[in-house]
Structure formats: C-alpha cells, structure tokens
Amino acid sequence: MGNNIKVTFNPDKIAAWWPAVGTYYTTTYPQNQSVFQPGIYQTTSLINPKNQQELDSVLINRYKQIDWNTWQGFPVDQKFSLVSRDPPPKPYINQSAQTFEIKPGPIIVPGIRDIPRGLVPPQTPTNRDQGRKPTPPTPPLRDTHPHLTMKNQTFHLQGFVDGLRDLTTTERQHNAYRDPFTTLSPAVPTVSTILSPPSTTGDPALSPEMSPSSLLGLLAGLQVVYFLWTKILTIAQNLDWWCTSLSFPGGIPECTGQNSQFQTCKHLPTSCPPTCNGFRWMYLRRFIIYLLVLLLCLIFLLVLLDWKGLIPVCPLQPTTETTVNCRQCTISAQDMYTPPYCCCLKPTAGNCTCWPIPSSWALGNYLWEWALARLSWLNLLVPLLQWLGGISLIAWFLLIWMIWFWGPALLSILPPFIPIFVLFFLIWVYI
C-alpha cells in the first residue's frame, strides 16, 4: 500500500507529514537545500518510520541525490503538485523541533467496514517486545451498532479529514513515473471516496409533478370523463330509440337484418350487435344525433350571448341616427370592449353618421332584417308572431297539450338530459 509524504521547504528545516505518525520538522540541517522542493509524493518503496531519526534519515540520505527536473532516482508513483511552489517564509528563530505521535482511533463509517487506504493500523504489542502482561479479565467487545456510536467518533473522523485535506490540492497531475525497484499501487483515495455517505435504498420519492394531490386530481378527472362518456352514450341510445319510435307508432318491430354467416338472435333495431347488417345504420343515426345535439348547444350559446348583448352587430337599418364630428368618431364597434357600442360611417362632408347598437338581441335583429331584405313574404308573419306573443295563455295551453301527448315518450329520454339542463340554467343565470 502506498504512503504519502508532504515535503515543504524553508531555509532552515524540512517539514514532512506522514500518515501513521504525524508532522515533523527535521533536526538535521540539509547540506544541499535546493534538493528539497515542495510537493506531495506517493511512494511504495519506503516503510513507515517509527521515530524522527528514521524520518530524518529518509529525507536527508534517500532524497538528496534526486534530479528534480527529470525525477530520476526518486521512488515515486505519482506526484501531486502544491498550489504554490514558492518557498514558505522563514520560521521563527525560537521554533523547536517537534515530535509527536497520532494514535488514531477506530474509524467507523456506516457501510464501510474496511480500513481506509493511507492509514496504517496500530501495531499490537507482543510479549517479546514489552514483556508478558496479565491477561485482561474481559476482551474488548466488538461494536455491533456503529450507528449508535457515531457521535463518539467525531474527533477521530475530524482528524482524519483534516489530514487528508492537507494531502489534496486544487490541481492534480496524473503522471505516473515508474520505478524499477518499486511496485506501482493505486493512489490513496480522497476524502470524498473514504467518507462518502452510504447509499440508501427505499421507496422512490414522488416528484413535484406527481404529488399526492395531483394524483388525486388526475384520478378524479378520469372518473368524471368516464361518467360523462357513459352519459353521452346513454343519451345517444335514448334519442335513437325515440327517433325510431316516431316512425313506428304501433311499436318498434324486431330487426330483420340478419347476417347469413353469423346468425344473431332477435333484437331491436336500436341495439344491433356488430354481426348484424343494421349495425352500421344504427351508428350512422347516432352520429347524426350527436351533430344535432352539438348544433343545439351552439344555438343555445349564441342566443345566450345575444341576449346579454355580448355580440355587437351593426343593424342594417338603424332607427336613430346622430351626426358628430369625425374627430370624435374614431372608435368602431369592433375596437370597443365595453358598452355602449356604436356604428359610425364617415361621409365626405367631414361629419360622421353614428347609430347605437342594441343592448340586447343585436344578432337576432340583424338576422331578421337580413331575412326580410331577401324574403319579403316574411312580413306577413309579423302580425301572427305579435299575436302569438300577446296571447300567452293560449301558448301555455298548447305547450301543456304537447307535453301531455308526448309525455310518456319524453319521460324515458329526459333523465339523461337533466344534468345538461341544470348546466344551461346555471350558465343562463350567472352570465
């Protein structure tokens, strides 16, 4: 396993950081100070020094004959350059040599059971070196719940992170130089790889687009669409039965369109199976019924908007006219969005002839005037329509008689239309 040495240069001493021991200032002054240059070196041919004397011997004797331009003679695998290669300032005069030893505790990280590379496990003393010691009464217990003791390891983890932060730099040169006397080893992992949080598995989190409220709204929308689709099919089937019953006052006969290849049972012409010849005609009738229903809805919407005065149409024959200056008559009915509307003409004399648009039934008056201009015989119906409008009691009696006559047949087809009638009534009231 490779070891990292951080070497810094100053006029008096050489400082090095060794993972297993700590930071040293050499007590021996180098003879050739230009040999030692700043950098972080990774080597595999050296063992960890046990004390400062071994480190001085390694730094002074082993590295002073290295050609730093070509890196010849240095047992190094990779070199990570520092941010600044300028020598640090001269230390204080009263600075003394420091020798200390770091005793790292066990680093317990959830999901990572191995010892991180770059750290050397503490050596267990043997009986040969330190003499025989009494056997402890109870062996140390193995930590089986690392997540419960994570708070107690904060100090050791912080020391390990600080040490590796000194080794890492902003710029790395991935140039490996092979040494014939050493064996290459992979680089020491950085803090991000050693102390990376363990990956957790579980239920995937819902994205903001698929929150529970939006999912509920989607399901409710699908239910409403399905309900409306079933009602539309029921309305078409009932209207088809009603239209067919008008052609057969004595009752709807059985369908006679039988297929020679697929014999079908007896059925009504309003519920033909796909194997029957009348199946296509049945769906053609229902398609025409759909078109008529859409046309009725469009007519109802136009009548409602015309009654509210939201369709500004200039009448063909205005009843009242006013003449104003053309400078004041610059806005037409299409450019105004709030009543009252007016229609203006600009003659050559310099004055404008304007007449107001009716506040209600403007489209109806326009269509009636357009029809009277092309069909003159409609003028004969004006007294009749005025008479029917004046005798409201007779009109009510006629309506009651028609409902009494067609009541039983209408009761079977009106229930599917009740939601539509309620919707139209609400639109009529609140618009």
Swiss-Prot record:
Residues bearing glycans: N351
Virion surface side: 2-214, 308-379, 430-431
GO cellular component: membrane; viral envelope; virion membrane
Region Disordered: start-end pairs: 115-147
Residue spans crossing the bilayer: 215-235, 287-307, 380-400, 407-429
Post-translational modification remark: Isoform M is N-terminally acetylated by host at a ratio of 90%, and N-glycosylated by host at the pre-S2 region.
Cellular compartments annotated: Virion membrane
Keyword Endoplasmic reticulum: no
Region Pre-S1: start-end pairs: 2-148
Region span, Pre-S: 2-207
Region feature Pre-S2, mapped onto this chain: 149-207
Reported function: The large envelope protein exists in two topological conformations, one which is termed 'external' or Le-HBsAg and the other 'internal' or Li-HBsAg. In its external conformation the protein attaches the virus to cell receptors and thereby initiating infection. This interaction determines the species specificity and liver tropism. This attachment induces virion internalization predominantly through caveolin-mediated endocytosis. The large envelope protein also assures fusion between virion membrane and endosomal membrane.
Domain comment in the entry: The large envelope protein is synthesized with the pre-S region at the cytosolic side of the endoplasmic reticulum and, hence will be within the virion after budding. Therefore the pre-S region is not N-glycosylated. Later a post-translational translocation of N-terminal pre-S and TM1 domains occur in about 50% of proteins at the virion surface. These molecules change their topology by an unknown mechanism, resulting in exposure of pre-S region at virion surface.
UniProt record similarity statement: Belongs to the orthohepadnavirus major surface antigen family.
Identification of the protein by name: Large envelope protein
Species annotation: Woodchuck hepatitis B virus (isolate 2)
